[in-house]
Amino acid sequence: MALSGMVTALTVSANPEISPLLSLLEGMSIGLAAGSIIGVLIAYFNILPIIATLGLMNILRGMTYLVSKGKWVSAYQMSTGFKNLSTGTTLGINNLIIFAVIIYIFYSYFINQTKTGRYIYAVGSSPETAELIGIKRRRIILLVYSLMGLLAGLAGVLWVSKFASAQGDTAVGYEMNVIAATVLGGVSVSGGRGRVTGIILGSILFGILANALPLINISPFWQQFIQGIVILAAIISNVLLQRRNERAALKKRAI
């Protein structure tokens, strides 16, 4: 997010006349490239996903500081058209809501109604079994990480557009927020289970929690503590539920 947002902001500041759509495509391309690299590392070099993602995250964060030379890109350096990507409206509806609805519809259909979507669930549940039945496991893994990189690039551009500021530490610490939202939304930490609708509901729930704590004058230090407890409880519940389902499935097979 930080790199795609920063590079796009630098491009916009140097070329104010550039189309906002091209700016969006630039950021998404950067995200797609980053996601593809992670996918290749995991699928073809068998690097653990958490190592590949966190490692490249730090590399890209460093690249963000390098390309920006440690400086910010501020609102006055950005064109009105670019800032309107997030803050503008279409038919009276905020553009961010429109982006969210389009993404939700596309990915809900893709993951639930297409053969590739079913393959993704299969690989998430058991990569080895999926490969035994003819699914190209490596291609599916590469596809998933590429698509997630594409969305991260889009999010980076929209973030910079909304806040009219690009900096090297954009979205630092949001990794845990994303994990919390997905787990609260019912996504299995071991893969193979989850719905786009659940992730949205989990994001809303986590957002309500994060915004409610300051309103009741909870200390920032306690806010982090409480959010951490919620994340941990959600993960434990997720794992216990999955184990219960696995035991139930084994009993059915035995019968």
Predicted regions and their residues:
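Single transmembrane alpha-helix segments in multi-pass membrane proteins
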Residues: 1-16, 40-46, 182, 186-196, ...
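Hydrophobic alpha-helical transmembrane segments
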Residues: 3, 20-29, 51, 97-102, ...
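Helix-loop-helix "hairpin" substructures at the membrane interface of multi-pass membrane proteins
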Residues: 19-26, 33-38, 42, 89-167
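Cytosolic-side transmembrane-helix boundaries in multi-pass membrane proteins
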Residues: 132-139, 209, 213-255
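Alpha-helical transmembrane segments within multi-pass membrane transporters and channels
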Residues: 8, 16-56, 201-202
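Transmembrane helix-bundle core of multi-pass membrane transporters
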Residues: 45, 49-114, 140-143, 162-171, ...
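Transmembrane alpha-helical segments in multi-pass inner-membrane proteins
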Residues: 35, 145, 152, 162-228
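Hydrophobic core segments of alpha-helical transmembrane domains in multi-pass membrane transport
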Residues: 57, 61-62, 99-109, 145-155, ...
